[in-house]
């Protein structure tokens, strides 16, 4: 069901800005330099900017849909109140014995009641403060519930199938990556091999994320800020170390850097979509904001900052290691760190595994641990909220607290079980990011925006004062056309990779 923050707490737009940035910037950012090294500097920047802009467009559509969903919920509540009042205020028609005064008084009450009912039910003008209040985002309506309100049962079921595949796939990837990273950094212990240590770290990871998944977004505020600091330090370190390498005269010249390799477009496609994904959690982190003016601006600034961070990292990586032919950065001895430049790796942190300072190399190697652990909690909360809405079996008989615990543990621990069974998640990454991610990021927001505005006009005869500037046929068709092209590219990439 729709609902606001369960404990009534809110936070500022600055805090929301941190949440959004943390959720967008994940391990996908570390895979971007590798995609740039294949696609080229210009093509990479253009494609990254295009995907970021399209992601912003579809994010505004979900905000728009969220405001319309709140408007509909408010109006349905008012209609129920009016129905109850009609039953309570019903008066028996006057008889011949009633006095004229009583009859006039009764008629006046009935007329007054009818006028009040019309005022409540009648849509107000497009620019009134009443409209703005009705469209205010006060209730958390998850994307899945919006699909049910605007797309009907078929759209609702399709969306939830796509969403659950995406979220469970995402969490399974994270659950396997974090303990793998820890095992690679620390190595085995005596008789315990790296493989055995992996399961120990997986158990610790489950113990960490399980309790946090019981909370809501606002309860993870300090964890989010700590992660933001850690992430920024790691980003700055990689950028600074790359610039130092360039300044020492070891970097690549502009002639050695790939510029525009259109045949490698598929190499950057999947990771670019993955790097801007935040749409599934928009209701969760926007609803608790205390002042919700200029939400489009808030999202836009976040996407711009993310693009600047991504672009800077990718450009310096190309000019630092774009001309290096050494395939790996591994050292002959694990006890002595001698910086060995290598080709841009699948994750950019691996370019610094042999850095002279062991502290720096280990810190960067642990970067996915900091990022993914926090993102895991946020996505787990999102999955729990959607499962609570999807599965309503015995909802009236089981307390909300028990349901919350059950679905929180389900959303956080099942992916851990998947990571326990397998550590090979490469195919899962491609399917999750390319197919399910495409549906959540592009297709569903377009459908929600189109049909929510259609319902608003046809049933309520009113336009949304918080309407997205991109809600028109041109952008709807553009997004759907791009989705088809992206689907073809993704399928081709998977076929040539796993044939």
Curated annotation (Swiss-Prot):
What is the protein's major site of localization? membrane
The way this protein sits in the membrane is described as: Multi-pass membrane protein
| Glycosylation site list | 97, 184, 351, 424
GO CC annotation: membrane
InterPro entries under this entry?
A: AA_transpt_TM (IPR013057)
Can the keyword Signal be found in this entry's annotation? no
Highest taxon of source: Eukaryota
List all membrane-crossing ranges: 16-36, 39-59, 158-178, 197-217, 234-254, 257-277, 303-323, 363-383, 402-422, 428-448, 476-496
Taken from the UniProt record, the cysteine pairs bridged by disulfide bonds within this chain are none
What subcellular compartments does it reside in?
Answer: Membrane
Q: Does the keyword Metal-binding apply?
A: no
Alphabetical UniProt keywords: Glycoprotein, Membrane, Transmembrane, Transmembrane helix
Q: Which family does it belong to?
A: Belongs to the TMEM104 family.
Q: What is this protein called?
A: Transmembrane protein 104 homolog
Q: Could you read off the lineage of the organism from its UniProt record?
A: Eukaryota, Amoebozoa, Evosea, Eumycetozoa, Dictyostelia
